[in-house]
Amino acid sequence: MQPFVYTTAPARIVFGTGSSVGVAEEIRRLGLSRALVLSTPHQKGDAEALAARLGPLAAGVFSDAAMHTPVEVTKRAVEAYRAAGADCVVSLGGGSTTGLGKAIALRTDAPQIVIPTTYAGSEVTPILGQTENGVKTTLRGPEILPEVVIYDAELTLGLPVGISMTSGLNAMAHAAEALYARDRNPIASMMAVEGLRAMIEALPGVRMEPQDTKARETALYGAWLCGTVLGAVGMSLHHKLCHTLGGSLDLPHAETHAVLLPYTIAYVEQAVPDQLAPLAALVGGRAGTGLYDFAARLGAPASLAALGVGGEDLDAMAELATANPYWCPRPVEKTAIRALLQRAFEGARPE
């Protein structure tokens, strides 16, 4: 066995249907007393209801979290945090809300409690992606990692089926890239395979019966594992392309992951098929084409064109993605990446 380093994320995980009733207890356990509740505008009502349940432990609600964590929104949130005299944040929602909580923590050292309502997985990573002037950058550090994550499947029962599918594929992208990361290790790989297995088991069940609590629990379990391995190893081509297109073209985050994943995995698979063999075994056939077929069965968006990307955008995106690429086991060449984007734009089966 080759030598390796595995760094575990020092977060407290509270998992179980109905567990979100313990938010107040978690705030007190941290020795805190003034929580600013965060959400997107869409989940403002849920955030206000949570703040009402917290009573005097709630310092207020900030409900303007947005995709790709725009720096201008973060500045307003930090002002609200300080004006409210808050001493922690409670992030209720998906990756956008979690990202805002991380951005506030980075600037104020605020402890974070996250209650995920999607399968994004970012709640267990020490990674923050934020956007300024149309450019998305990524930061990593222990101060970004939330202190407590509460997984309650009841809070995902209202997640629309379409978003559930793309959010789940987003989580799977984290685990898929962990299998061939430069700093991969057997512990992270084991968690990645289990996370992928859980998502592949759960998502068809969620699609067929959105109120199936058992399937929702399995999906949350898979999302936790997939997100955890993203925090334990480095990112590669897939996340680079998603960050480039998402930040530059303001594309929906999970949907971008869902569309690109089969193509990026097929690209890398040509260089390291053995490392992606566990994923190939789970989806059947080859990893890239198997993911393409799996996403199609879930009814996920099939092309970049369906997300609003124009053919005229592809040259610039290929240029940006290859100007400062993440490490990748297969050389990242502009011509090859442009061809990858073309197939993803058309929704053609990966090569």
Curated annotation (Swiss-Prot):
Domain of life of the source: Bacteria
UniProt GO molecular function: alcohol dehydrogenase (NAD+) activity; maleylacetate reductase activity; metal ion binding
Catalysis: reaction(s): 3-oxoadipate + NAD(+) = maleylacetate + NADH + H(+)
UniProt EC number: 1.3.1.32
Outcome (variant: residue 243 to A): Retains 0.4% of wild-type specific activity
Subunit text: Homodimer.
Domain remark from Swiss-Prot or TrEMBL: Each subunit consists of two domains: an N-terminal NADH-binding domain adopting an alpha/beta structure and a C-terminal functional domain adopting an alpha-helical structure.
Chain's role: Involved in the gamma-resorcylate (2,6-dihydroxybenzoate) catabolism. Catalyzes the reduction of maleylacetate to 3-oxoadipate.
Name of the protein described by the UniProt record: Maleylacetate reductase
Taxonomic source organism: Rhizobium sp. (strain MTP-10005)
